[in-house]
């Protein structure tokens, strides 16, 4: 029973399935029927399905048949109706075809016109769209064109503003276009280009100020010079006023520059107005030589670009480099003043520019930076000046340099730079200046002394007399009364040296001007320098002349006279210094002049040289001595050489009557002493091993000639026998031997009033030995054998006694 | 015996107007020096220079005289002892040449008869300022039978030649000494042979 229910259930399911399949066959396309049919064949109900399918087919056939039967008559009527319509339709067709052919023929042009109208409408739409797009793009292009123009005309700041506008306002609206992309890509490049071009302008500017530093500095120095000249006439007020005016002008420029870069001004074409205004203005100093606008523009551009710090660093770095270049002195700067002037002009120009930048920009440079730069500059300048000024050998150049340094310092002081170190250095240069002056005057004195004729100055007229007296403070009533022609006692070098000393004092004074020294300091400095001139320079010059190899008595005598007069003139030099410094001699701590010492020393040296000179002449005569020490002949006159010698001395003292008395006396005494000493040496020298009484007698004649000279009073002022005392030693020695007065000598030796007080026993023995040798040699003469033997015994006896004296004297 | 450092002593004298260059001529010869500044000689001065001629050492004692008239008395006293005298004039100074005749008369009056003489025309380097032609100097020398040189102390022209020539002329008139004979001081004797050589 369960099996039957189950079969019935399956049959219902199958029936439902078959129904579904049949609906699918009826609704699905042929292409999809395959899977459906396969599902039928997969099952086991194929036969049943076929039955149902056949059933459904017969049903559908009956439905169709019924329908056809029902509508048969209507169908027939319709067919009849249709056949009628077909005829009518054919007529209509023919008519329409004909109409169409006519219409086609007639409306051909209209069709063409319609086509054209269609094209026009299309174009119009395109044009309208294009115009709409272009209206959006046009401002961009205009801005870009403007940008290009501004770049071309190098108005970079406006260009930068245009660029900003373009980038942030206009381009975003049309960013989808390709050319806009190109623009956007180019903007960074353009920005860089503006930076680069601005930097290039700055570099040109830096080059310009470097090139014009010299001119700028020169102008500033000249202005300072003019200001100083004015200060010497009017009050201090004009200086302050001038300075204010300068600052004011600077600020005016600054304001103008700011205005010229503002957007408002740009839009209103204000640049032209401003430029015209600039042209009309007269700007002093740096403004006339250098256009500062590039640095201002560049500063603004970099500020806008957010690179201000980069710009500041670059500017300061470059200026430091330029400072080092400016501070590098040319290697031959010391040769001319122009070398120094150019150097100073460059430095001043550099700092004038920096000062201007400081006051016309907002922080591009600051006081700390400039002060640091100035400190470096000052130390380098001072070092350079120390080095180069030490090469200067021309005092005029040193003096001009000092004036230039003062002007340099004053100029920079006006701009607020501290310059005390420069004035300190000027005091060092002053010492060097003094040294240079001393060298110069050494040359001057040498020339004066070398070119002097060492003769008294002759004057033939009152005019000439007054001229000499005007140059040198000499007063002599006796000389003044003498008739012309007459002579001053001194030679040309006296007034010349005196005047040159005064010139030296003037030169020292010149250097002290503008150094802010007190009168007492100046006076002290001048006296010290003058002392050096007198005690060192002039002294050396005089000594060099006096020690010259071929100096003659003429020159030496005149130098003695000249230095006497120069010594007396020292008090007038003191007065001269007092007059030009207005410092009284009584002032405490005033340095004194020591010139008198120089002239005394020179005079003493000249005197010594006279004595030496005379003695050398005497020596030359003595070298001509030609004694025959073995002669037996008795001469009757002095040796020829000695006669000449005495004649020379006599004529020398006769012609040098202008030699001061004491000097003449000393010279004469010195000559006589030298002559006596030399003759004694001649007699006693070892090379003379033997001599005869005859030789002694000839020698005695020569000594008598000398004594005659001494007695004759060759130089006034000697006491009766003072000069003769020079020969007393010789006289006593010769008397002793010629008179063979040994008994008296030996008996009286040691007595205070003995006749041969000045005969030294050693000397006597030496001479006696020479005579003994002579006697021995003559032993061979038979006829004198006895006498000679006796004499030899006597000589031996005396020699023995002399040795005894010598021995006892020693013990 | 003291040894002499020379064989013979010749005494020479320089005379002429002031400023012709006598002292400069002497300095050039004795010290080979020249001083551009003119310093007037006062009175008398001398230099000694040893030269060697014909194997003999000869000391030349050369006296330099002041040319100024005020020293005339002193300078003429030296004429007597001179063995050779140089008369100096300045070729740029006609007056100094004209005065040569005066100086020649002084020699005749004050010097030994047999003194050897020589004429010097100094400053011949200053030809652009010459006023005395060389021919004039030669002529007056020829007339007096004496040697003539144009010299320049500044440029050192003919200086040594002049002195050595004069010394040779004096030597030629000096008696030859016998070997080992006693040395005789020539100047102390008056026996020098008096023949005078002619120059042309």
Swiss-Prot record, chain A:
Complexes and interactors: The exocyst complex is composed of SEC3, SEC5, SEC6, SEC8, SEC10, SEC15, EXO70 and EXO84.
Organism: Homo sapiens
InterPro entries, per the entry: EXOC6/Sec15 (IPR007225), EXOC6/Sec15_C (IPR046361), EXOC6/Sec15_C_dom1 (IPR042045), EXOC6_Sec15_N (IPR048359), EXOC6PINT-1/Sec15/Tip20_C_dom2 (IPR042044)
Keywords noted in UniProt: Coiled coil, Disease variant, Dwarfism, Exocytosis, Protein transport, Transport
Disease: Spondyloepimetaphyseal dysplasia with joint laxity, 3: An autosomal recessive bone disease characterized by multiple joint dislocations at birth, severe joint laxity, scoliosis, gracile metacarpals and metatarsals, delayed bone age and poorly ossified carpal and tarsal bones.
Superkingdom, taxonomy of origin: Eukaryota
Region forming the signal peptide: none
Keyword presence, Coiled coil: yes
Protein name: Exocyst complex component 6B
Curated annotation (Swiss-Prot), chain B:
Lipid tethering residues (S-geranylgeranyl cysteine): 199-200
Positions of short motif Switch 1: 32-46
Tissue and organ expression note: Expressed in the hippocampus. Expressed in neutrophils (at protein level). Expressed in the testis (at protein level).
InterPro entries in alphabetical order: P-loop_NTPase, Small_GTP-bd, Small_GTPase, Small_GTPase_Rab
CDD domains in UniProt: Rab8_Rab10_Rab13_like
Topology of the protein relative to the lipid bilayer: Lipid-anchor
A GO CC annotation given for this chain: endosome
Effect of residue 68 to L: Probable constitutively active mutant unable to hydrolyze GTP; accumulates at the base of the primary cilium and alters the basolateral recycling pathway in epithelial cells
Name of protein: Ras-related protein Rab-10
Presence of keyword Cell inner membrane: no
Gene source species: Homo sapiens (Human)
Quaternary structure (record): Interacts with MYO5A; mediates the transport to the plasma membrane of SLC2A4/GLUT4 storage vesicles. Interacts with GDI1 and with GDI2; negatively regulates RAB10 association with membranes and activation. Interacts (GDP-bound form) with LLGL1; the interaction is direct and promotes RAB10 association with membranes and activation through competition with the Rab inhibitor GDI1. Interacts with EXOC4; probably associates with the exocyst.
Domain notes: Switch 1, switch 2 and the interswitch regions are characteristic of Rab GTPases and mediate the interactions with Rab downstream effectors. The switch regions undergo conformational changes upon nucleotide binding which drives interaction with specific sets of effector proteins, with most effectors only binding to GTP-bound Rab.
Underlying gene: RAB10
Family listed: Belongs to the small GTPase superfamily. Rab family.
MF GO annotations: cadherin binding involved in cell-cell adhesion; G protein activity; GDP binding; GTP binding; myosin V binding
Key words, A-Z: Acetylation, Cell projection, Cytoplasm, Cytoplasmic vesicle, Cytoskeleton, Endoplasmic reticulum, Endosome, Golgi apparatus, GTP-binding, Hydrolase, Isopeptide bond, Lipoprotein, Lysosome, Membrane, Neurodegeneration, Nucleotide-binding, Phosphoprotein, Prenylation, Protein transport, Transport, Ubl conjugation
Needed co-factor(s): Mg(2+)
Biological processes annotated in GO: antigen processing and presentation; axonogenesis; cellular response to insulin stimulus; endoplasmic reticulum tubular network organization; endosomal transport; establishment of neuroblast polarity; establishment of protein localization to endoplasmic reticulum membrane; establishment of protein localization to membrane
Subcellular location, record wording: Cytoplasmic vesicle membrane; Golgi apparatus membrane; Golgi apparatus, trans-Golgi network membrane; Endosome membrane
Listed result of changing residue 73 to D: Phosphomimetic mutant. Reduces interaction with GDI1
Annotated positions of the N6-acetyllysine modification: 102
Glycyl lysine isopeptide (Lys-Gly) (interchain with G-Cter in ubiquitin) crosslink, residue number(s): 102, 136, 154
């Amino acid at each position: 029973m369960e099996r039957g229910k189950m079969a019935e259930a399956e049959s219902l399911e199958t029936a439902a399935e078959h129904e579904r399949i049949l609906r699918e066959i009826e609704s699905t396309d042929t292409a999809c029927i395959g899977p459906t049919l396969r599902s039928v064949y997969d099952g086991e109900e194929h036969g049943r399905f076929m039955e149902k399918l056949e059933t459904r087919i017969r049903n559908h056939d009956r439905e169709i048949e019924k329908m056809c039967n029902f509508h048969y008559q209507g169908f027939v009527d319709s067919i009849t109706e249709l056949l009628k319509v077909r005829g009518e339709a054919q007529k209509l067709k023919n008519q329409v075809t004909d109409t169409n052919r006519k219409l086609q023929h007639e409306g051909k042009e209209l069709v063409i016109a319609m086509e054209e109208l269609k094209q026009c409408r299309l174009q119009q739409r395109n044009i309208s769209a294009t115009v709409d797009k272009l209206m959006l793009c046009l401002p961009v292009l205009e801005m870009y064109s403007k940008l290009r123009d501004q770049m071309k005309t190098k108005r970079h700041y406006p260009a930068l503003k245009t660029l900003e506008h373009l980038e942030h306002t206009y381009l975003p609206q049309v960013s989808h276009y390709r050319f806009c992309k190109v623009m956007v890509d180019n903007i960074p490049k353009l920005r860089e280009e503006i930076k680069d071009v601005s930097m290039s302008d700055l570099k040109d500017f830096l080059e310009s100020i470097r090139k014009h530093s010299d001119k700028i500095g020169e102008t500033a120095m000249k202005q300072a010079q003019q200001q100083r000249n004015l200060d010497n006439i009017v009050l201090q007020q004009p200086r302050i006023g001038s300075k204010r005016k300068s600052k004011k002008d600077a600020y005016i420029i600054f304001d103008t520059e700011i205005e010229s870069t503002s957007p408002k001004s740009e839009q209103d074409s204000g640049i032209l107005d401003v430029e015209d205004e600039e042209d009309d203005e007269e700007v002093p100093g740096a403004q006339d030589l250098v256009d500062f606008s590039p640095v201002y523009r560049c500063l603004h551009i970099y500020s806008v670009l957010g690179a201000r710090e980069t710009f500041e660093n670059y500017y300061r770095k470059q200026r430091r480099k330029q400072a080092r270049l400016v501070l590098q002195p040319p290697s031959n700067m010391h040769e001319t003043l122009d070398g120094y002037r150019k150097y100073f002009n460059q430095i001043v120009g550099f700092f004038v520019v920096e000062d201007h930048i400081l006051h016309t920009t907002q922080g591009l440079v600051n006081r700390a930076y400039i002060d640091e730069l100035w400190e470096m500059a000052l130390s380098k300048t001072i070092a350079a000046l120390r080095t180069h000024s030490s090469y200067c050998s021309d005092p005029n150049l040193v003096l001009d340099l000092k004036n230039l340094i003062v002007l340099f310092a004053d100029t920079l002081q006006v701009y607020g730079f501290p310059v005390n170190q420069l004035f300190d250095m000027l005091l060092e240069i002053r010492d060097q200046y003094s040294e240079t002056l001393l060298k110069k005057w050494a040359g001057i004195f040498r020339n004066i002394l070398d070119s002097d004729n060492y003769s008294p100055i002759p004057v033939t007229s009152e005019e000439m007399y007054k001229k000499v007296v005007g140059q040198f403070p000499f007063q002599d009533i006796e000389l003044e009364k003498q008739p012309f022609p007459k002579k001053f006692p001194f030679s040309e070098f006296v007034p010349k040296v005196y005047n040159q000393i005064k010139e030296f004092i003037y030169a020292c004074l010149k250097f002290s001007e503008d150094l802010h020294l007190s009168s007492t300091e100046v006076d002290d400095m001048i006296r010290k320098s003058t002392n050096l001139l007198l005690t060192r320079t002039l002294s050396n010059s005089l000594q060099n002349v006096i020690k010259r190899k071929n100096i003659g008595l003429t020159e030496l005598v005149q130098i003695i006279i000249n230095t006497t007069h120069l010594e007396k003139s020292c008090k007038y030099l003191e007065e001269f210094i007092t007059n030009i410094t207005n410092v009284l001699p009584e002032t405490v701590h005033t340095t004194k002049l020591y010139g008198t010492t120089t002239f005394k020393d020179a005079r003493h040296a000249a005197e010594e040289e006279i004595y030496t000179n005379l003695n050398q002449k005497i020596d030359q005569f003595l070298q001509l001595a030609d004694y025959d020490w073995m002669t037996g002949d008795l001469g009757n006159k002095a040796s020829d050489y000695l006669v000449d010698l005495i004649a020379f001395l006599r004529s020398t003292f006769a012609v040098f009557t202008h030699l001061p008395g004491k000097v003449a006396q000393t010279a004469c005494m010195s000559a006589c002493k030298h002559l006596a000493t030399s003759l004694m040496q001649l007699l006693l020298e070892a090379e003379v091993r033997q001599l005869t009484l005859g030789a002694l007698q000839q020698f005695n004649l020569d000594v008598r000639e000398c004594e005659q000279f001494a007695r004759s009073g060759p130089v006034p002022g000697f006491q009766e026998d003072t000069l003769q005392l020079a020969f007393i030693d010789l006289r006593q020695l010769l008397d002793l031997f010629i008179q063979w007065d040994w008994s008296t000598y030996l008996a009286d030796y040691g007595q205070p009033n003995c006749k041969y007080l000045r005969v030294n026993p050693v000397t006597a023995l030496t001479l006696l030995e020479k005579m003994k040798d002579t006697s021995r040699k003559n032993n061979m003469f038979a006829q004198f054998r006895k006498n000679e033997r006796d004499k030899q015994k006597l000589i031996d006896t005396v020699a023995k006694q002399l040795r005894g004296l010598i021995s006892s004297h020693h013990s | 015996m003291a040894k002499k450092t020379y064989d013979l002593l010749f005494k020479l004298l320089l005379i002429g107007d002031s400023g012709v260059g006598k002292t400069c001529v002497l300095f050039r010869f004795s010290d080979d020096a020249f001083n551009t500044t003119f310093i007037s000689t006062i009175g008398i001065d001398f230099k000694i220079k040893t030269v060697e001629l014909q194997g003999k050492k000869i000391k030349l004692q050369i006296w330099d005289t002041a040319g100024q008239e005020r020293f005339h008395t002193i300078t003429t006293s030296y004429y007597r002892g001179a063995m050779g005298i140089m008369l100096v004039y300045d070729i740029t100074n006609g007056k100094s040449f004209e005065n040569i005749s005066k100086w020649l008369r002084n020699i005749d009056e004050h010097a030994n008869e047999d003194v050897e003489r020589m004429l010097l025309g100094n400053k011949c380097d200053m030809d652009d300022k010459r006023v005395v032609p060389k021919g004039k100097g030669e002529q007056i020398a020829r007339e007096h039978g004496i040697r003539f040189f144009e010299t320049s102390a500044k440029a050192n022209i003919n200086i040594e030649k002049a002195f050595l020539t004069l010394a040779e002329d004096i030597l030629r008139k000096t008696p030859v000494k016998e070997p080992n004979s006693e040395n005789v001081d020539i100047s102390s004797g008056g026996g020098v042979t008096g023949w005078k050589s002619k120059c042309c």
